[in-house]
Each structure stands twice: as structure tokens, then as C-alpha cells.
Amino acid sequence: MLKEFKEFALKGNVVDMAVGIIIGGAFTGIVKSLVGDVLTPPLGLLLNGVDFTNLFVVLKEGATPGPYLALEQAQSAGAVTLNYGLFINAFISFVIMAVAVFFLVRGINRLRKMTEKPPEPAAAPDTKECPFCFSAIPVKAVRCPNCTSQL
């Protein structure tokens, strides 16, 4: 059983998948930082200084009544909130991740096509059909060996 597990774990596909998951986790952190620290602040400035992380709707007030200026205030007061600003950040992250994966897969597919050998042309047939008896005969035959017809 240990031998079977070792064979499974050391297969190329399993190792490749593990590397992909690790790199994907690191890439997720980079994309989250790109969205939260680089893209949404200028976008917020264009929208009169809106901070997307603080875009929320209070569904039910908490122990201390509102208004709450920041999401952290509402959450610390125990308010139930609908955090659509965090959803916008997550959606932007998803779009960036999807575009990055699309271009990565597209590049890999192009490389794969470049390294693939073109298919070999089909060999010319070495037999043909006799028009009189319909049996298979060599292409170069001038007389059918079965019905002795002149071809």
C-alpha cells in the first residue's frame, strides 16, 4: 500500500497539480493586493473619494445605534451589514484572475502548437478495386489476377 501511494504521489500530474496550487495561492495574494492597494484607491478618487471597503448597507443595527462611518464600526457594534464594497473588490479580483489565467492558458496552447510535429501525410494507397470483379488488386496491376480482365 505504501508503494502504491508513493507511485501515486510521485506521478508527474500530482506534483504538477501541487505546484500549481502553491503558485495559485501566491498569485491570489498578489491579485488581492493589486485590487485593494493599487486599483481601487484611484477608482475611489475618481468617484469622489469612495473607499470600496466601506461601502455597505446596514440591515439591522447593533448594540450601539448608527450611523456607522466605517464597516469596522458597524461590525464591532454587532450590526448586520450587506458589504457590497467588499463584493466589488472580490469581483475585480476575479476578473483580473480570470484574464490572467486566460492569457496563461492561451500562451501555453500556442507553445504546445509550436512544438507539435505536423501530422504526417497519409501514404498513397497500395491497392485499388477491380472495376469488373470488385476485388482488391495492387495499384500497378494492368490485369486483374482474379478475373483476368484487362485494366
From Swiss-Prot:
Name this polypeptide is given: Large-conductance mechanosensitive channel
Annotated membrane topology: Multi-pass membrane protein
Residue stretches spanning the membrane: 19-39, 85-105
Function: Channel that opens in response to stretch forces in the membrane lipid bilayer. May participate in the regulation of osmotic pressure changes within the cell.
GO cellular component terms listed in the entry, alphabetical order: plasma membrane
Keywords (A to Z) from UniProt: Cell inner membrane, Cell membrane, Ion channel, Ion transport, Membrane, Transmembrane, Transmembrane helix, Transport
Compartments reported by the entry: Cell inner membrane
Gene coding for it: mscL
Homology family: Belongs to the MscL family.
Keyword Nucleotide-binding: no
Superkingdom, taxonomy of origin: Bacteria
An example Gene Ontology molecular-function term: mechanosensitive monoatomic ion channel activity
Matches recorded under InterPro entries: Mechanosensitive_channel_CS, MS_channel, MSC/AndL, MscL_channel
PANTHER family in the record: LARGE-CONDUCTANCE MECHANOSENSITIVE CHANNEL (PTHR30266:SF2), MECHANOSENSITIVE CHANNEL MSCL (PTHR30266)
Subunit structure: Homopentamer.
Species in which this protein is naturally found: Chlorobaculum parvum (strain DSM 263 / NCIMB 8327) (Chlorobium vibrioforme subsp. thiosulfatophilum)
Keyword Transmembrane applies: yes
One Pfam entry name: MscL
Disulphide linkage map: none
